[in-house]
Amino acid sequence: MACSLKDELLCSICLSIYQDPVSLGCEHYFCRRCITEHWVRQEAQGARDCPECRRTFAEPALAPSLKLANIVERYSSFPLDAILNARRAARPCQAHDKVKLFCLTDRALLCFFCDEPALHEQHQVTGIDDAFDELQRELKDQLQALQDSEREHTEALQLLKRQLAETKSSTKSLRTTIGEAFERLHRLLRERQKAMLEELEADTARTLTDIEQKVQRYSQQLRKVQEGAQILQERLAETDRHTFLAGVASLSERLKGKIHETNLTYEDFPTSKYTGPLQYTIWKSLFQDIHPVPAALTLDPGTAHQRLILSDDCTIVAYGNLHPQPLQDSPKRFDVEVSVLGSEAFSSGVHYWEVVVAEKTQWVIGLAHEAASRKGSIQIQPSRGFYCIVMHDGNQYSACTEPWTRLNVRDKLDKVGVFLDYDQGLLIFYNADDMSWLYTFREKFPGKLCSYFSPGQSHANGKNVQPLRINTVRI
């Protein structure tokens, strides 16, 4: 069996790897220092021999072995553990009966003699068994990562497919909802149009009948008046005094019923009923059939923080810079957060209201569980029973989620619309000026909800002094 590579590179004198190898005439190799010291010890005998074959030399010449020195240098550049751990049982090189190694850096099998060692300097080289074990672990880790990625992609695809189906279903449902909403408006408009046209026809018929009756009556009276005038003209044409005077006595009888006072009275056709701000008139008549309309909410003074000032009608709330009001504390009242709740509690149905937030730099509005804590510092977030949006830092808007969700608002809000569909678990915020969407909470509400308002603190420099005001639509 062939010797290991290390055995081939050992000096037989020091039993270590060659250092500055030299060769003798017999072609055996030694470390220059080792053979020199050996021959120094033999000087007394007057002969110098080869420690391997015992061939003697009178004046031996030490020839440097550059090739062997290169092999030693290249061998030394490989990790010693890799060389020592190589097994003779490893797959042999076809050209050399030597142990094959594996370069982990290049991912390649290599033979020390066949391959150029310089190509693998500073590389991670190991034995076949160690390379097998390490690459097995590495590939298993990669397989696990791929399997994890496969599972994540499968779950993502399932989610996307579910969202695709839900989006299609929601779109179909929304088409129906939008169609029904507009059809209801169309139906209401058609009904109002029909009623108005019928009313117009009735007014027209009534007016025309009245006029026609008066035309008939005045036509009859006109004929009698004309007859009376004819009688008088004939009498006045009589020039004979006796004849003229003789017929005067019968004139009164002949003129009876011929003279009528006009006294014409009539009502103008009611055109004003069908002109003027016609669309506004129609809108007002439709308003009672539109649902939901902005609710006339009021604030609950019993929940208001002591710093808050409410209007007499409880629709306006402002932060007061003066000392806190001497209000009686109760479990209902906020004691740290400058907040107030609405008086009405919602547990079903569809509701909508609007809040004027113009010229403010800070506020919070939305909904709160009726049972939510009102004492101490409160985290305004769904897990605490609050579903709100907030204006902060002067011109930023966020939904109070966990963490906050920044809202994409182009222009500063002047009025915010709040839409609640309790049964569907929807709370939607709008820019009430153009009804553009701001944010949607989708929740399964566990109990009664109250509208929530916080005007924020005002500042001595005049910032945020404007109140929050519930917008009441009056028809």
UniProtKB/Swiss-Prot annotation:
Binding residues annotated for Zn(2+), in chain numbering: 93, 96, 114, 120
GO molecular function: identical protein binding; transcription coactivator activity; ubiquitin protein ligase activity; ubiquitin-protein transferase activity; zinc ion binding
Entry keyword set: Coiled coil, Cytoplasm, Immunity, Innate immunity, Metal-binding, Transferase, Ubl conjugation, Ubl conjugation pathway, Zinc, Zinc-finger
UniProt domain B30.2/SPRY: residue ranges: 277-475
Enzyme superclass (EC): transferase
Family assignment from sequence similarity: Belongs to the TRIM/RBCC family.
Protein name: E3 ubiquitin-protein ligase TRIM62
Species assigned in the record: Homo sapiens (Human)
Lineage of origin: Eukaryota, Metazoa, Chordata, Craniata, Vertebrata
